[in-house]
Amino acid sequence: SKKSIVEAASIVSDELREKADLATQTYNEHYKNGTHTKADKANMQAATTKLAYFINNVVNAVEDEKLCSVFYYAIKASKQAPEVFFRDAMTNSYSLEKLVYLVKSIKSGKCTYSVADMSGSRVFALIDMINDEIDTFTNGAVFDLMNEAKKACEIKLDAGYTQANQLINLCERLGLVEKVKGAGSAKAGTQQYRFIKNDFYNYLADAFKA
């Protein structure tokens, strides 16, 4: 339920706050007695940044009825408990950036590639294919979409399929796509995937209808 997602986000933000407080306390104590290190400072900065990011992009989003739906469907499709989902997301910033970009895109009603968020905004490729009602696709097709967007922005193109594969892996974990067994090779850019037309897919299709 959406209520359990709000509660889970609150629990995980409390955990992150504890870590940030502890890291800050450690740094301050070490600073006072002259034993502080670069690592102490880096740990404190990383922990406080993580907490702020989670509050701004997840906690605030789940309190908004419309935006909470992104996490609701993503968590439902991933078949994870909400707390586990959020903890995993915080350890995999690559995935979280994409989900957060998706949330922001739903708020604005459009999902496009952005030079301001080159990692998160790659999720546009997924939305483009859903909008075009494509049933099956290859990792090479995702790679091409990403490079078309980068070319339009006049920035360096991807040389290999790593970024395309990472986006597809996230979509697999979220229960949005599945690999077509025995069809193509990921290394050659010919591995085939198909969309799973579940609640999450339908939600995304509705959210970005032209």
Q: Which ranges hold each PLM region?
A:
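Short amphipathic alpha-helical interaction segments
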Residues: 155-173
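Long, low-complexity, charged/polar intrinsically disordered regions in eukaryotic proteins
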Residues: 8-13, 21-122
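Short, amphipathic alpha-helical "recognition" segments used to contact nucleic acids or chromatin
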Residues: 125-133
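Intrinsically disordered, low-complexity, charge-biased tails
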Residues: 1-4
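Minor-groove-contacting beta-hairpin "wing" of winged helix-turn-helix DNA-binding domains
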Residues: 184-196
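Short, amphipathic alpha-helical interaction segments positioned at domain boundaries
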Residues: 194-210
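A short, conserved structural fragment
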Residues: 172-184
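Short acidic, hydrophobic short linear motifs in intrinsically disordered regions
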Residues: 132-155
